[in-house]
Amino acid sequence: MVLISTSQGDIRLKLDEENTPKTAANFLSYVRSDFYKDTLFHRVIPGFMIQGGGLNAQMETKNTETSVENEAKFGKKNTRGSVAMARTSDPHSATAQFFINLADNAFLNFSAENAQGYGYCVFGEVVEGMDI
């Protein structure tokens, strides 16, 4: 379990280390190094998702480690309450930023091993705090 403390309340995550071991280990590495301390959810789109993990309170981008392989084809779907890695147009570019799905977002799921179909890797789920 991972605890995210925000100004609005706490969010508890359960990671899917069985199906997405590289992605879960990547996220835990950032957690254990206190990388996420004093970061914020900088992208909030009601009815879609909230994204965080890359910017500090001054809206400055934090330096990250190398990217992690996209394990979306092994993971779960982008449903309400799932936690997925944010990335650029490169399917294997995820580093520290992640998002919580506020709705079922099937269009973000894996569909093919190409740039358009790789999707966004779900590596966990919110088990407490979706209501904050």
Roles of regions detected by a PLM:
Residues 1-132:
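Cyclophilin-like peptidyl-prolyl cis-trans isomerases
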